[in-house]
């Protein structure tokens, strides 16, 4: 039976009353469900292991029952027992699509992501582009299916968002220096693949990319997904006290860990990390890589230049410390923040297919690729836009 389980919101759509505060406890024996709520209309029913709210404004919120929740917990006394209660700030889980005139946006998860339909990337109109850009800022990551585009098409579409960013790792394809191949061959059993580990793209640059784009050409039949986590939602759900602590901090971003790992486990022929792996002594790295290993500082909390939305800027791969703190002081803070950002409630996951084009706001989310497709070829092409 169920001993003492807690219910946590995995998705709350637009339109749920901003005054909602709740906790849910299930107990065995009488199988009682106790609810404390305010401004929550309609009945709540138990369906399998989930509690379901009636639809409001075309949306439906679902509460998943879980044994543990790693963040956002506080303790309350209830009948002489200590009960963990999850309280999500109201209105933060709002990934509902806006009304568009020339495109259709279909949300991918409660936290972020949307599929954009009704668009041919090779012939995007000005009206469509404005709505695509708006959808990107709202959903943090958007993607298009069944696109048949050339390198010229991808470069041209990317350039509409701004100037190309400096590429940290790879050389571009012939004739298109800003379109970088991201390829893993079927016969390469890599211990480390490009993009594995939670990360922002190139945060060690003085101007990290604002937007990143990937186009899938050859996709394995199994594995090879990409997952994103919403750093803005993660920041919004922290306490005001934590906000005050984090706001003045500067984080150090460096390629140091990637270089060390690549030199240890990646073969010189493995693209695009082979350029690093080919040089086994960090002192012999090319000058441009030396600069990226040295890294730079960025604010831990950054405001989006277009929307003003505040987001955490740290990751598992490139963040090496906090300015003015010892490693012993900084590491627990950074570990907590990355764990908080990457909890499943804040993520969306994309299953690639040939012809899928995905783009994301590198300032508002982090992502990682999965190394789970050995024996199959994976070919994508990346462009990045300067921040």
Regions found by a protein language model. Give the residues of each.
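Short, positively charged and aromatic/hydrophobic N-terminal segments
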Residues: 34, 43, 66-73, 81
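Hydrophobic alpha-helical membrane-insertion segments
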Residues: 20, 29, 42-45
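Non-heme Fe(II) oxygenase catalytic core, chiefly the N-lobe of the double-stranded beta-helix
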Residues: 80-357, 362-387
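N-terminal polybasic/positive-inside topogenic patches
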Residues: 24-25, 35-37, 50, 55, ...
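N-terminal helix-forming leader/targeting segments
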Residues: 1-4, 29-35
């Amino acid at each position: 039976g169920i001993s003492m389980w807690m219910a946590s919101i995995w998705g709350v759509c637009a339109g749920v009353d901003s005054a909602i505060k709740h906790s849910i406890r299930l107990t065995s024996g009488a199988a009682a469900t106790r609810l404390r709520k305010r401004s929550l209309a309609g009945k709540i029913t138990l369906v399998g292991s989930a509690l379901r709210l009636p639809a409001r404004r075309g949306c439906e919120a679902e509460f998943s029952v879980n044994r543990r929740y790693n963040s956002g917990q506080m303790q309350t006394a209830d009948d002489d027992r200590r009960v963990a209660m999850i309280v999500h700030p109201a209105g933060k889980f709002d990934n509902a699509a806006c009304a568009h005139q020339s495109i259709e946006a279909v949300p991918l998860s409660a936290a972020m992501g949307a599929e954009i339909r009704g668009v041919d990337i090779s012939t995007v109109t000005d009206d469509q582009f404005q709505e695509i850009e708006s959808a990107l800022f709202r959903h943090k990551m958007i993607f298009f299916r069944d696109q048949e585009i050339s390198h010229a098409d991808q470069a041209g579409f990317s350039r509409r968002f701004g100037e190309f960013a400096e590429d940290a790792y790879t050389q571009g394809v012939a004739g298109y220096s800003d379109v970088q191949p991201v390829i893993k061959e079927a016969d390469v059993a890599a211990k480390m693949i490009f993009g594995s580990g939670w990360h922002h793209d190139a945060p060690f640059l003085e101007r990290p990319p604002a937007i990143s784009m990937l186009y899938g050409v050859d996709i394995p039949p199994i594995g090879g997904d990409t997952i994103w986590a919403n750093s803005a939602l993660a920041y919004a759900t922290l306490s005001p006290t934590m906000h005050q602590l984090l706001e003045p901090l500067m984080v150090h971003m460096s390629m140091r860990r990637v270089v060390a790992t690549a030199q240890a486990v990646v073969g010189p022929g493995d693209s695009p990390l082979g350029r690093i792996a080919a040089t086994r002594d960090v002192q012999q790295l090319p000058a441009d890589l030396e600069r990226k290993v040295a890294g730079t500082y960025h604010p831990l909390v950054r405001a989006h230049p277009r929307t003003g939305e505040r987001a955490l800027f740290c990751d598992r791969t490139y963040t090496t410390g906090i300015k003015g703190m010892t490693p012993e002081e900084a590491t627990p803070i950074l570990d907590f923040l990355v764990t908080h950002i990457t909890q499943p409630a804040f993520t969306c996951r994309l299953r690639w297919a040939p012809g899928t084009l995905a783009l994301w706001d590198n300032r508002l989310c982090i992502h990682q690729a999965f190394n789970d497709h050995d024996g199959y070829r994976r070919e994508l092409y990346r462009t990045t836009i300067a921040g």
